[in-house]
Amino acid sequence: MSSGNISNLPARRPFMRRRKVCPFSGENAPAIDFKDPKLLLRYMSERGKIVPSRITAVSAKKQRELARAIKRARQLALLPYVVD
């Protein structure tokens, strides 16, 4: 293939990434509560660390609430600090 012959290649469409929406905003969104370990475990890694908001698409305000709830649940032994 010659290096100067690019005119006959099909044009690529740019990849449009879908905007993520915060799962805690909206009318029927779940409330962040430290007494709900099932909900909080969805936002923790398999090693027990809090997953960052750029991965979970949680807004900054709700990420702070989520981190606070996870830390409270850890203190009350509802969630583990680390998982081996």
UniProtKB/Swiss-Prot annotation:
GO molecular function terms noted in the UniProt entry:
small ribosomal subunit rRNA binding; structural constituent of ribosome
A GO cellular component term found in this entry reads: cytosolic small ribosomal subunit
Q: Name one Pfam family in it.
A: Ribosomal_S18
Q: Which GO terms describe its biological process?
A: translation
| Assembly | Part of the 30S ribosomal subunit. Forms a tight heterodimer with protein bS6.
Question: Mind telling me which PANTHER family this protein's record contains?
Answer: 30S RIBOSOMAL PROTEIN S18 (PTHR13479), SMALL RIBOSOMAL SUBUNIT PROTEIN BS18M (PTHR13479:SF40)
For the keyword Ribonucleoprotein, the answer is yes
Alphabetical list of NCBIfam families matching this protein = S18
What is the name of the protein in this document? Small ribosomal subunit protein bS18
Organism whose genome encodes this protein: Maricaulis maris (strain MCS10)
- Keyword Transmembrane on this protein? no
